[in-house]
């Protein structure tokens, strides 16, 4: 066979695998830290499937290097903040959040809201820098993207989608009080059995816990509607040239990909345009580096404990570090501790410090017995995926809530970072390692995580491709978005029906009074005769 005909046959075969019509263009509004890591997993899969992905990132973005030879196209827009300034602000606010006094609800959540508003101001300034950049916006319009993809906790993507007349897909873990989910997405969270995120309650609440949950919900609703959204509403109205709100603009999203799952979250109703894709980043463990593998194998039958408080915790106080190190020195297991700071004086021979650890690969190692975690959702999903019981030491944000969920499901023990003693940590580790119930419970969650008809990552990619193929998914969007709040709750209908009932009762009473008056009059007339 000639070279010419061989080439033709190869091209025909390749045409079955690649089709220019099936490849789309995705515009991404960048996120930071763990939010970006989850999005990146989806984006890399989209690139693998032949789609063109453009990430819109500020010049202050921490995780993006325009010179990095990545398959993702990075479109950098200038902003007034420098990368160092932005990183310092984030670390300061996270440090402040983790140190907030938890004595009273009002004090904790009011100060937490201030931190969220600070982040909101920064994000809004980034958004202004984008939409006011006429050259960049013209370039984006010419690119004719098929979909905008973003983490909903960082607003602006919905404004870009509106300006570019492009469908929108959200990825989201949570927002405080489920504010965006409820008021923008129309999600349903009945407070009678769905605990407000960050309340640390379970779905089986006592009467007083339901009262507490209702107060939390009303507090977050009030702060969101009265204070938090005013600046966004004004900004969006100015840019679009018509009165609008953040809730209205976000409510136009075609699909919400929630990074949650039913083995993690408590059951509650979902809308047709919402799908759970929690644990999409989880994957089988890879072999460990040689030195680390040797250390793990040296643990023998006792196994190892993996310890990480995440990338946001640096320069731990010496007193706390020594308390933890002293506890770890007392257990028979070897410990791999992700730690960036001064070496604790009480560090035992069984513990090794690392500035970075391959967490997923360690959790998937057969010798791993327990995971000490701050309660970040990524780490918890990896522990569930590999079936490793946890000791939770939550610090801020959704971490206390995440650990509360794992504790309610019998897969974790919780400790308080500021008050725990060495004895507390030792006892917690002994409990989750030696009590077989914890292993059984987390293995049950693991089996559920693995037993899905379609993997979370494949579902996430499917919905993005679905939106690109059909130029949106408006057929899944509930009509509730088009109703006012009193129409949504049928208050106008209830008012009308009450008015009808009141009118009927009024007429009946009038008739009765009239009849009574008639009979009374006749009686008097008869007596007089």
UniProtKB/Swiss-Prot annotation:
Origin superkingdom: Eukaryota
E.C. number(s) listed in UniProt: 2.4.1.17
Subcellular location: Microsome membrane; Endoplasmic reticulum membrane
Reactions it catalyzes: glucuronate acceptor + UDP-alpha-D-glucuronate = acceptor beta-D-glucuronoside + UDP + H(+)
UniProt-listed InterPro entries: UDP-glycosyltransferase, UDP_glucos_trans, UDP_glycos_trans_CS
Class in the EC hierarchy, top level: transferase
Parts of the chain that traverse the membrane: 493-513
Swiss-Prot/TrEMBL keywords: Endoplasmic reticulum, Glycoprotein, Glycosyltransferase, Membrane, Microsome, Signal, Transferase, Transmembrane, Transmembrane helix
Residues annotated as glycosylated: 67-68
Protein purpose: UDPGT is of major importance in the conjugation and subsequent elimination of potentially toxic xenobiotics and endogenous compounds. This isozyme displays activity toward 3-hydroxyandrogens. It is principally active on C19 steroids having a hydroxyl group at position 3-alpha of the steroid molecule and also active on planar phenols and bile acids.
The protein's name: UDP-glucuronosyltransferase 2B18
Organism: Macaca fascicularis
């Amino acid at each position: 066979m000639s070279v010419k005909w061989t080439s033709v046959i190869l091209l025909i075969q390749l045409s079955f695998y690649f089709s220019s019509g099936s490849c789309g263009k995705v515009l991404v509004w960048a996120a930071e830290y763990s939010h970006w890591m989850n999005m990146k997993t989806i984006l890399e899969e989209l690139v693998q499937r032949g789609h063109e992905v453009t990430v819109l990132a500020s010049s202050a973005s921490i995780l993006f290097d325009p010179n990095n030879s990545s398959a993702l196209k990075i479109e950098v827009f200038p902003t007034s903040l420098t990368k160092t300034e932005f990183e310092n602000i984030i670390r300061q606010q996270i440090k402040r959040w983790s140190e907030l006094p938890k004595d009273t609800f009002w004090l904790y959540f009011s100060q937490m809201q201030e931190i969220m508003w600070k982040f909101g101001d920064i994000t809004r300034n980034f958004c202004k820098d984008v939409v006011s950049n006429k050259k960049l916006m013209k370039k984006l319009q010419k690119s004719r993207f098929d979909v905008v993809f973003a983490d909903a906790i960082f607003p602006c993507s919905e404004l870009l989608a509106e300006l570019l007349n492009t469908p929108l897909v959200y990825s989201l873990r949570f927002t405080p009080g489920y504010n965006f989910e409820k008021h923008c997405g129309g999600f349903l969270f009945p407070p009678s059995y769905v605990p407000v995120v960050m309340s640390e309650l379970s779905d089986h609440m006592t009467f007083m816990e339901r009262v507490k949950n209702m107060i939390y919900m009303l507090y977050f609703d009030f702060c969101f509607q009265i204070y938090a959204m005013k600046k966004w509403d004004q900004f969006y109205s100015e840019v679009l040239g018509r009165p609008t709100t953040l809730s209205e603009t976000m409510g136009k999203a075609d699909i919400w990909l929630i990074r949650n799952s039913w083995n993690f979250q408590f059951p509650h109703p979902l809308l047709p345009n919402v799908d759970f894709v929690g644990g999409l980043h989880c994957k089988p463990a890879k072999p460990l580096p040689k030195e680390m593998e040797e250390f793990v194998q040296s643990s023998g039958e006792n196994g190892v404990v993996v310890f990480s408080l995440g990338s946001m915790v640096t320069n731990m106080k010496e007193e706390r570090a020594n308390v933890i190190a002293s506890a770890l020195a007392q257990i028979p297991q070897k410990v791999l501790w992700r730690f960036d700071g001064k070496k604790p004086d009480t560090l035992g021979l069984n513990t090794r410090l690392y500035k970075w650890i391959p967490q997923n690969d360690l959790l998937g190692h057969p010798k791993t017995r327990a995971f000490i975690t701050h309660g970040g959702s990524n780490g918890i999903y990896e522990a569930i995926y590999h079936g490793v019981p946890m000791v939770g030491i939550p610090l801020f944000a959704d971490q206390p809530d995440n650990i509360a969920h794992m504790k309610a499901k019998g897969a974790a023990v919780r400790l308080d970072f500021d008050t725990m003693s060495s004895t507390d940590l030792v006892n917690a580790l002994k409990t989750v390692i030696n009590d077989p119930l914890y292993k059984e419970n987390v293995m049950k969650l693991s089996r559920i995580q693995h037993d899905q008809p379609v993997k979370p990552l494949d579902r996430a990619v499917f919905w993005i491709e679905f939106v690109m193929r059909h130029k949106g998914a408006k057929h899944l969007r509930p009509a509730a978005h088009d109703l006012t709040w009193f129409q949504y709750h049928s208050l106008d209908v209830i008012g009308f029906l009450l008015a009808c009932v009141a009118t009927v009762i009024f007429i009946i009473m009038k008739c009765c009074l009239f009849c009574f008056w008639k009979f009374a009059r006749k009686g008097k007339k008869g007596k007089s005769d």
